[in-house]
Amino acid sequence: MRKIKKAIIPAAGLGTRFLPATKAMPKEMLPILDKPTIQYIVEEAARAGIEDIIIVTGKHKRAIEDHFDNQKELEMILQEKGKTDLLEKVKYSTELANIFYVRQKEQKGLGHAIYSARQFIGDEPFAVLLGDDIVESDNPAIKQLIEAYEETGKSVIGVQEVDEAQTHRYGIIDPLQKFGRKYEVNEFVEKPKQGTAPSNLAIMGRYVLTPDIFDYLATQGEGAGGEIQLTDAIERLNRADQVYAYDFEGDRYDVGEKLGFVKTTIEYALKDESMHDELVEFIKKLKLN
């Protein structure tokens, strides 16, 4: 069985929920404290043993490439001023993994974005990490899926429980037999209508896929929202060759919408010893209804 050493991070979306901030800045570069959200995703992949990452970009995404590239002039200035802590942080972001880029020329959905990276992946199994979900866990979420793949040799989809009222926002699994945190899946349903979801186990932005998925993406028609949905291709793969779901451990932060982004920023700030006490005092003084 081939080891998983490659990952895809889709980052071609327009980020319309964060306009006008994302008119000129990629959504993935919006910071949680002092790091852009996409760096948290790359760090998770690196901690899981991923060596090569391809980021699928679109127009106006050059800032992502610049962030993970060497900035020699900046490094020299920091070195001369003795700001070694900042220098190490700047250099760290360039040393996480081998990072490559491919452009999704048309906004045709997540499935199309993944298909855009097929030449980079070749015939290897690979990981997918979506940028809207930051996951905090001792064992990285994607590493948990890789370990499940190593047990089964099959594609593994990361899931977590959500409130039943929110199931229409996600891809949902119809689970069959359960093995610990791993499920056999009867069906994958993309964004079911309210009240029709087969469970409350939602697909949460982490995947380990065999290269067979590209055969299904190549012929996948439009699905929900008029886009080529990855979930639909996974469901077709599941009919031909068992796909598993894995209820991964970890705290998930939704940074793909404004309220979740604010909550994440506050929680991360409270974890930072340098600002915790002052932030707590500030929150206490707010006139909250």
Curated annotation (Swiss-Prot):
Pfam families: NTP_transferase. It catalyses: alpha-D-glucose 1-phosphate + UTP + H(+) = UDP-alpha-D-glucose + diphosphate. It is an enzyme of class 2 (transferase). GO terms for molecular function: UTP:glucose-1-phosphate uridylyltransferase activity. Transmembrane segments: none annotated. GO terms for biological process: enterobacterial common antigen biosynthetic process; UDP-alpha-D-glucose metabolic process. Belongs to the UDPGP type 2 family. Catalyzes the formation of UDP-glucose from glucose-1-phosphate and UTP. This is an intermediate step in the biosynthesis of diglucosyl-diacylglycerol (Glc2-DAG), i.e. a glycolipid found in the membrane, which is also used as a membrane anchor for lipoteichoic acid (LTA). This is UTP--glucose-1-phosphate uridylyltransferase 2. It comes from Staphylococcus saprophyticus subsp. saprophyticus (strain ATCC 15305 / DSM 20229 / NCIMB 8711 / NCTC 7292 / S-41).
